[in-house]
């Protein structure tokens, strides 16, 4: 790769999850594209190749963990669990929790997603797996 692309890649690696999300939104606005539409097309292609029926019968292996809501009295405890799960700093994790409903972890294994769901629900949060 060129020096310029290496520098861009290094900059992207240093972004927090919240900063990466903001970057995606800015790119979508600047170029008139949608990251969600592209992902949907990519995800639809494997199902079409297998005939569709088999894909529906397979068990889902990756889950998105979504914080739906939380008890106001449990906000700090929920915030701590989100920080532990995401590795975000205090400010970024606080912004994520306050933006509920919000996806806090994407592509988690079934075991990791269930463990995170139990941990957050144990301290007063409401979580769904998608």
Swiss-Prot record:
GO terms for biological process: translation. It comes from the Bacteria. One of its GO terms (molecular function) is mRNA binding. One of its GO terms (cellular component) is cytosolic large ribosomal subunit. Keywords: Ribonucleoprotein, Ribosomal protein. CDD domains: Ribosomal_L7_L12 (cd00387). InterPro entries: Ribosomal_bL12, Ribosomal_bL12_C, Ribosomal_bL12_C/ClpS-like, Ribosomal_bL12_oligo, Ribosomal_bL12_oligo_N_sf. SUPFAM superfamilies: ClpS-like (SSF54736), Ribosomal protein L7/12, oligomerisation (N-terminal) domain (SSF48300). Belongs to the bacterial ribosomal protein bL12 family. Forms part of the ribosomal stalk which helps the ribosome interact with GTP-bound translation factors. Is thus essential for accurate translation. Homodimer. Part of the ribosomal stalk of the 50S ribosomal subunit. Forms a multimeric L10(L12)X complex, where L10 forms an elongated spine to which 2 to 4 L12 dimers bind in a sequential fashion. Binds GTP-bound translation factors. This is Large ribosomal subunit protein bL12. It comes from Prochlorococcus marinus (strain SARG / CCMP1375 / SS120). The lineage of its organism: Bacteria, Bacillati, Cyanobacteriota, Cyanophyceae, Synechococcales.
């Amino acid at each position: 790769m060129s020096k310029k692309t290496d520098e861009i890649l290094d900059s992207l690696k240093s972004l927090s999850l919240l900063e990466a999300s903001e970057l995606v939104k800015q790119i979508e606005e600047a170029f008139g594209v949608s990251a969600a539409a592209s992902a949907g097309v990519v995800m639809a292609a494997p199902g079409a190749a297998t005939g569709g029926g088999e894909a529906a019968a397979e068990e889902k292996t990756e889950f998105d963990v979504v914080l739906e809501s939380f008890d106001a009295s449990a906000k700090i405890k929920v915030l701590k669990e989100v920080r532990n799960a995401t590795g975000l700093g205090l400010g970024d994790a606080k912004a994520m929790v306050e933006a509920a409903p919000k996806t806090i972890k994407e592509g988690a294994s079934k075991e990791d997603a269930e463990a995170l769901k139990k941990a957050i629900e144990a301290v007063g949060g409401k979580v769904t797996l998608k």
